[in-house]
Amino acid sequence: LMAMSVYHIMDKTMLGLLSTYKQVGYLGFGPQESYIDKHHAAQMGVYETTVQNMFVDYAKPQENGSVYGTRWASLTDENGSGILFAGKPFSFHAGDYTSDELFEKKHSFELKKSGSTIVHTDYFMSGVGSGACGPELAQKYRLEERNIHFCLMLTPFHRREDPFEKLAIANNIWKEQEKI
């Protein structure tokens, strides 16, 4: 018999982008996946990777590869053209599989790529915890908020551009919105 607690795991936005957007850049905790309760093993920095390399192959497919504390993230094609996401710290992940695909399959070899680059931008993602083999997730790593205000700037982007300039623009926009 297993006891299980149910609580809100995330407040998520999911986008399907062109499958040609395979190059990833971000300012966040990395270079490996990082969650609110596990990010101390990562370092805040600017990282470059690929959608394929963000995938973490667990014994059973599940949500994976998220980057905690992301300030900006870019997805570009081989020519450097793409999209930039900028915001107050958010969790970010780009992958080849939908959440449903990861949830429904029991083994990685059963996974079918979606044909798009699936992007998750989460206001908050609860910690991973160790509930399957240890204590349940600590209260401080759970999403308890009921009223959420989450703004994210999406803008065309090229690798030649400075993502920090776009982040500064986004920060100015949010400061003005907070005055209203």
Roles of regions detected by a PLM:
Residues 1-180:
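Beta-strand/loop-rich accessory regions of lumenal/periplasmic or secreted enzymes
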